[in-house]
Amino acid sequence: MAQTLNRSLTDLGALLHLVDPTLPIGGFNHSNGLETFVQQRVVESKATLEEYVQTQLLQNWIYNDGAYLSLAFDAMCEGNFDRLCELDWQLSATKVARESREGSFKLGVRLLKIFIRYETHTLLTAYQQAIAEKRVQGYFPIVFAMVAQAMGLSKADTLYAFYYNAAVGVITNGVKLIPLSQMDGQDILFDLRGSLVQAVELSLDPDEEWLGAATLANDIRAMQHEVLYTRLYMS
């Protein structure tokens, strides 16, 4: 009983560390197109911010970052390094907005730099070497999956933590940009609980035919962000 409890708490601690908002990777610098939506007054209220997050979660992330995370987790379980590299290349091709693409691999490289100090795994070492040799970019969802699997976390817990972390980031940025009250942000996060579970269920065994399906409006806003006259975020 005590051994099971200790393992459960150890896993929880590892998961909380992985999604710690104070990790020095620079995630708070990126809005991934949200800033453009706010400047264009498409997202301008609590209701429209919640709609935006729901759309991102269930119409974008589950076919993009979440799906790639799920597949990378499987590749780690199988010890398939070539598959991890292939997923990195595919994800690079689907991230059409330059700022979002660069932001993702910068976060991934920094995340790997932190956790490779604590997790000794041959695939983490090989992947870091491949990044150094510019054979892969090191995208955030792939690194997130690799680190989580190396820690011994479950895929479902990893997906939930990833989606929760992404949703919190969008809500935090939206509250700041629109602006909204902090309580509005908490209300949106509370209302997302069911959708987060749904996203995990849809991502456990992703259909590879749907990889890269995205919200075109978000891709366009992410590209437009490059030429905004004033901006707070890097993407």
Curated annotation (Swiss-Prot):
Family matches, as Gene3D superfamilies: Urease accessory protein UreF
Record's keyword terms, sorted: Chaperone, Cytoplasm, Nickel insertion
Keyword set includes Ribonucleoprotein: no
Transmembrane portions of the chain: none
GO MF annotation terms: nickel cation binding
Superkingdom of the source species: Bacteria
Compartments (UniProt record): Cytoplasm
UniProt-listed InterPro entries: UreF, UreF_sf
A Pfam short name: UreF
Function per UniProt: Required for maturation of urease via the functional incorporation of the urease nickel metallocenter.
HAMAP family tied to this protein: UreF (MF_01385)
Self-association state and partner proteins as the record states: UreD, UreF and UreG form a complex that acts as a GTP-hydrolysis-dependent molecular chaperone, activating the urease apoprotein by helping to assemble the nickel containing metallocenter of UreC. The UreE protein probably delivers the nickel.
Similarity-based family: Belongs to the UreF family.
Name the UniProt record assigns to this protein: Urease accessory protein UreF
Gene: ureF
